[in-house]
């Protein structure tokens, strides 16, 4: 059926072609000997064909008077006279200036143009026809700047829209076409060129100075605005090279704002590269920076990488984070937070981003804001806290879920005395057990605890109850050890724990500990502590780094990871450049069997007094000395996880032998102190008093059905063997790299035996998170579970901080 349908359509098209009265046909004048000449203008003759009862218009060939072209054959005399008058007025400049016109196809195109655009001048027609010789005709030159048509456009406008650079040159050089003439929409030739597909046309226009380059149309858009709106990156580049101005205000701001509004990354980058100040420009309507206009993570990231102020405010006082939350753009929110946006910034009416997020029914966004430091008890100008906003949500399920979310981190509900809230309500709420300020026994977290009266009052969420104001004595009599597990991107959990410790103590991690040991991701964080990088900064770095490093499939390219490490620690920085606190990173020497644990230190290694583990009957290259060891290489060696990254020379990930480096660090400290005593420097030795071990989160325990590997005798047993081998392999890897279990028990027992305070902080995660996880939502949820863990173990944190701050 489709075949017959196409056949019918084809036959219909052919029939119309031959029945078209305006079909141009080459004829001989001898065929019209018996016809009457009705009119004659130049080479055009209108003939009445008596036998056919038609009126034919014939263009006599200037080269051969006996031949010509029939332009139409009409049955109506009136129509024939009208069309003859039109043709006789428009055709002469063409057949007088170029022999190319005297072809059936060209004449057909030209006559169709004349009929379809009766208001066009001969110059407009010449542009569409595209024959250069025609532009030397005096009549065509005389109409070069004519705007007498329905659009009010000049022939130059048409040439630019068509993208015909050769015709453009003819118009400008021979016809002296003006480039600043506007059409009915206020658009110049530059606007038309932008809408075309040939950047060369725009480049030719820009060679001559013209006001049209920066002319605004009736919508207030310059050609640069229009190019940004349409995403014509190459057009933007040419306009900027032609010195188009970036600081002309349009209805939505500068061209950079237009590029951001329509998410045209390439256009925005072009503008910023030409004028870096545009990144800070404010639009006239909202007083918003380009970052406020970012609609996706890619656009926001591009601006922030180029130095855009992440906390710039609009006329209403809102930051870009406020706008991203209001528009429910979670990806933008995450980019802004990871680049250091203030999660507690007060905007219009005193609302923080968390106030706005409560009405969006987006749990991930609420979690992200709180995880990145948003205070849940901050009232706005109306005295409303985020929890009160949540309690006003009309959807009961959403309302309960949000309030339960707050309760998991210690939210208490009560009525503060503020204007507009009755004291009777306040006192009634204060007597409710859920609103009690006594936090010694918080109620169990369950939706069943949320009664109707719990949903109405103004809520005040948790305060860090264990914050201490005392500062530690710089001359401590004992040493403190911090140990950081390996775990890939789950190092974010360690960061969140360290942020809580810093917030509670008011002291940077670097000043709380004398020794820091780390494996893999823990090693990177140990170096970050050594080089005085804040944990809030590192949290953002980790979120940004994962998208750079974990691209493609495993094993990942090492280049992005190495570039990241060089960028953060310096390409030529040595381990011994910073000496306090003492830092050790674990690595696995894989150029020998059995493999050996190696420690990258920022101090000289203690001299060994014990016999070597193996007989050194082979020639092995000694490790690099700390003074010569590059920091970024040490971090790369410690984090060379097999199947994730290729080995760094002879080094594999330290997690193969010490994913929890606590016992190895304590052994190292003991050997270091013994070496100091042997060297007569026993007065410099300090006893270890506190060991803090931070994990990257415990994965949930799951049942394993089969780890049996045997010789199969049938297909069913073969499948069981394959499955068992897979599970067994996973179990072997997990056992080798397990940082919890007996490793923690042994460390705790050792510390208790020698009188050392031991703290193991490692939250239970709800799901198994891979080392190369890139989902923001998954990682934010892991940090949320860490926040819940911190609140539930607040007494342990309080005790730890008190001990760390004691002399």
Curated annotation (Swiss-Prot):
<keyword id="KW-0040">ANK repeat</keyword>
<feature type="short sequence motif" description="DGA/G">
    <location>
        <begin position="653"/>
        <end position="655"/>
    </location>
</feature>
<dbReference type="GO" id="GO:0017171">
    <property type="term" value="F:serine hydrolase activity"/>
</dbReference>
<keyword id="KW-0963">Cytoplasm</keyword>
<feature type="repeat" description="ANK 7">
    <location>
        <begin position="349"/>
        <end position="378"/>
    </location>
</feature>
<dbReference type="GO" id="GO:0019731">
    <property type="term" value="P:antibacterial humoral response"/>
</dbReference>
<comment type="subunit">
    <text>Homodimer formed by catalytic domains tightly interacting through a large hydrophobic interface. The contact area involves 3 alpha helices, several loops and a part of the beta sheet from each monomer. Both active sites of the dimer are in close proximity adopting an open conformation that provide sufficient space for phospholipid access and favoring cooperativity in deacylation-reacylation reactions. Each monomer has 9 ankyrin repeats stacked side-by-side in an elongated structure oriented outwards from the catalytic core.</text>
</comment>
<feature type="short sequence motif" description="GXSXG">
    <location>
        <begin position="518"/>
        <end position="522"/>
    </location>
</feature>
<dbReference type="GO" id="GO:0046338">
    <property type="term" value="P:phosphatidylethanolamine catabolic process"/>
</dbReference>
<keyword id="KW-0597">Phosphoprotein</keyword>
<feature type="repeat" description="ANK 2">
    <location>
        <begin position="185"/>
        <end position="215"/>
    </location>
</feature>
<keyword id="KW-1003">Cell membrane</keyword>
<dbReference type="GO" id="GO:0006935">
    <property type="term" value="P:chemotaxis"/>
</dbReference>
<feature type="transmembrane region" description="Helical">
    <location>
        <begin position="512"/>
        <end position="532"/>
    </location>
</feature>
<keyword id="KW-0812">Transmembrane</keyword>
<dbReference type="GO" id="GO:0046469">
    <property type="term" value="P:platelet activating factor metabolic process"/>
</dbReference>
<keyword id="KW-0677">Repeat</keyword>
<protein>
    <recommendedName>
        <fullName>85/88 kDa calcium-independent phospholipase A2</fullName>
        <ecNumber>3.1.1.4</ecNumber>
        <ecNumber>3.1.1.5</ecNumber>
        <ecNumber>3.1.2.2</ecNumber>
    </recommendedName>
</protein>
<feature type="short sequence motif" description="GXGXXG">
    <location>
        <begin position="486"/>
        <end position="491"/>
    </location>
</feature>
<dbReference type="InterPro" id="IPR036770">
    <property type="entry name" value="Ankyrin_rpt-contain_sf"/>
</dbReference>
<comment type="function">
    <text>Calcium-independent phospholipase involved in phospholipid remodeling with implications in cellular membrane homeostasis, mitochondrial integrity and signal transduction. Hydrolyzes the ester bond of the fatty acyl group attached at sn-1 or sn-2 position of phospholipids (phospholipase A1 and A2 activity respectively), producing lysophospholipids that are used in deacylation-reacylation cycles.</text>
</comment>
<dbReference type="GO" id="GO:0004622">
    <property type="term" value="F:lysophospholipase activity"/>
</dbReference>
<feature type="active site" description="Nucleophile">
    <location>
        <position position="520"/>
    </location>
</feature>
<feature type="repeat" description="ANK 1">
    <location>
        <begin position="151"/>
        <end position="181"/>
    </location>
</feature>
<feature type="repeat" description="ANK 9">
    <location>
        <begin position="382"/>
        <end position="403"/>
    </location>
</feature>
<dbReference type="GO" id="GO:0016607">
    <property type="term" value="C:nuclear speck"/>
</dbReference>
<dbReference type="InterPro" id="IPR002641">
    <property type="entry name" value="PNPLA_dom"/>
</dbReference>
<feature type="transmembrane region" description="Helical">
    <location>
        <begin position="481"/>
        <end position="501"/>
    </location>
</feature>
<dbReference type="GO" id="GO:0047499">
    <property type="term" value="F:calcium-independent phospholipase A2 activity"/>
</dbReference>
<keyword id="KW-0112">Calmodulin-binding</keyword>
<keyword id="KW-1208">Phospholipid metabolism</keyword>
<feature type="region of interest" description="Calmodulin-binding (1-9-14 motif)">
    <location>
        <begin position="678"/>
        <end position="687"/>
    </location>
</feature>
<dbReference type="GO" id="GO:0034638">
    <property type="term" value="P:phosphatidylcholine catabolic process"/>
</dbReference>
<dbReference type="GO" id="GO:0005739">
    <property type="term" value="C:mitochondrion"/>
</dbReference>
<dbReference type="GO" id="GO:0042802">
    <property type="term" value="F:identical protein binding"/>
</dbReference>
<feature type="region of interest" description="Calmodulin-binding (IQ motif)">
    <location>
        <begin position="749"/>
        <end position="760"/>
    </location>
</feature>
<feature type="active site" description="Proton acceptor">
    <location>
        <position position="653"/>
    </location>
</feature>
<dbReference type="GO" id="GO:0035965">
    <property type="term" value="P:cardiolipin acyl-chain remodeling"/>
</dbReference>
<keyword id="KW-0496">Mitochondrion</keyword>
<dbReference type="InterPro" id="IPR047148">
    <property type="entry name" value="PLPL9"/>
</dbReference>
<dbReference type="InterPro" id="IPR002110">
    <property type="entry name" value="Ankyrin_rpt"/>
</dbReference>
<keyword id="KW-0145">Chemotaxis</keyword>
């Amino acid at each position: 059926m489709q075949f017959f349908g196409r056949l019918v359509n084809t036959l219909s098209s052919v029939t119309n072609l031959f029945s078209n009265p305006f079909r141009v046909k080459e004829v001989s004048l001898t065929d019209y000997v018996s016809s009457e000449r009705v009119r004659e203008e130049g080479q055009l003759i209108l003939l009445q064909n008596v036998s056919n009862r038609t009126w034919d218009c014939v263009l006599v060939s200037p080269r051969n008077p006996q031949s010509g072209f029939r332009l139409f054959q009409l049955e109506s005399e009136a129509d024939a006279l009208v069309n003859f008058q039109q043709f006789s007025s428009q055709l002469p400049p063409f057949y007088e200036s170029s022999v190319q016109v005297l072809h059936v196809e060209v004449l057909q195109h030209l006559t169709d143009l004349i009929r379809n655009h009766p208001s066009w001048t001969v110059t407009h027609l010449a542009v569409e026809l595209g024959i250069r010789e025609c532009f030397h005709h005096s009549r065509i030159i005389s109409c070069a700047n004519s705007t007498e048509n329905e659009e009010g456009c000049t022939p130059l406008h048409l040439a630019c829209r068509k993208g015909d650079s050769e015709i453009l040159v003819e118009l400008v050089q021979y016809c002296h076409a003006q480039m600043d003439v506007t059409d009915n929409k206020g658009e110049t030739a530059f606007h038309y060129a932008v809408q075309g597909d040939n950047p060369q046309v725009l480049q030719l226009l820009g060679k001559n100075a013209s006001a049209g380059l920066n002319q605004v149309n009736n919508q207030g858009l310059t050609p640069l605005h229009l190019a940004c709106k349409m995403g014509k990156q190459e057009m933007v580049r040419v306009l900027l090279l032609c010195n188009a101005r970036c600081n002309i205000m349009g209805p939505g701001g500068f061209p950079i704002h237009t590029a951001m509004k329509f998410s045209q990354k390439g256009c925005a980058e072009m503008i910023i590269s030409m004028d870096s100040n545009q990144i800070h420009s404010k639009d006239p309507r909202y007083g918003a920076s380009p970052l406020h206009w970012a609609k996706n993570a890619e656009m926001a990231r591009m601006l922030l990488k180029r130095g855009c102020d992440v906390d710039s405010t609009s006329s209403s006082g809102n930051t870009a984070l406020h706008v991203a939350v209001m528009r429910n753009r979670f990806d933008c929110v995450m980019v802004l937070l990871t680049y250091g946006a203030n999660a507690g910034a007060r905007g219009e009416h005193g609302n923080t981003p968390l106030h706005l997020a409560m009405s969006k029914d987006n749990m991930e966004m609420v979690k992200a804001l709180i995880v990145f430091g948003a205070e849940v008890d901050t009232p706005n100008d109306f005295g409303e806290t985020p929890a009160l906003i949540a309690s006003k949500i009309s959807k009961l399920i959403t309302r309960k879920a949000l309030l339960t979310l707050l309760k998991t981190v210690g939210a208490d509900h009560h009525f503060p005395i503020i204007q507009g809230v009755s004291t009777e309500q306040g006192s009634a709420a204060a007597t409710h057990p859920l609103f009690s300020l006594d936090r010694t026994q918080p109620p169990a977290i369950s939706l069943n605890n949320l009664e109707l009266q719990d949903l109405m009052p103004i809520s005040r969420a948790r305060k860090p109850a264990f914050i201490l104001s005392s500062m530690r004595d710089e001359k401590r009599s004992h040493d403190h050890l911090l140990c950081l597990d390996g775990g890939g991107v789950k190092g974010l959990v360690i960061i969140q724990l360290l942020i809580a410790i810093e917030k509670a103590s008011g002291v940077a991690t670097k000043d709380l500990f004398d020794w820091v040991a780390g494996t893999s991701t823990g090693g990177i964080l140990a170096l970050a502590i050594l080089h005085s990088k804040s944990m809030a900064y590192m949290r953002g770095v980790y979120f940004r780094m994962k998208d750079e490093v974990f691209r493609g499939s495993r094993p990942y390219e090492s280049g992005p990871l190495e570039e990241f490490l060089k960028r953060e620690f310096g390409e030529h920085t040595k381990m011994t450049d910073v000496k306090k606190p003492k830092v050790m990173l674990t690595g696995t020497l894989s150029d020998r069997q059995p493999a050996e644990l190696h420690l990258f230190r920022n101090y000289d290694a203690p001299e060994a007094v014990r016999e070597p583990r193996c007989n050194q009957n082979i020639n092995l290259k000694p490790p690099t000395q700390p003074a010569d060891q590059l920091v970024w290489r040490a971090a790369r060696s410690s984090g060379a996880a097999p199947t994730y990254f290729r080995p760094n020379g002879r080094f594999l990930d330290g997690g193969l032998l010490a994913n929890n480096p606590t016992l190895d660090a304590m052994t190292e400290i003991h050997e270091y102190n013994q070496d100091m005593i042997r060297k007569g420097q026993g007065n410099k030795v300090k006893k270890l008093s506190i060991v803090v071990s931070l994990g990257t989160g415990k994965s949930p325990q799951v049942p394993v059905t089969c780890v049996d590997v045997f010789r199969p005798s049938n297909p069913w047993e073969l499948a069981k063997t394959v499955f068992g081998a897979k599970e067994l392999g996973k179990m072997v890897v997990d056992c080798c790299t397990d940082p919890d279990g007996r490793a923690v028990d042994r460390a705790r027992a050792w510390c208790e035996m020698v009188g050392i305070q031991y703290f193991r902080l490692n939250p239970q995660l709800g799901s198994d998170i891979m080392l190369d996880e890139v989902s923001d939502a998954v990682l934010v949820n892991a940090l949320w579970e860490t926040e819940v863990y911190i609140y539930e173990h607040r007494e342990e944190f309080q005790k730890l901080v008190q001990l760390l701050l004691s002399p």
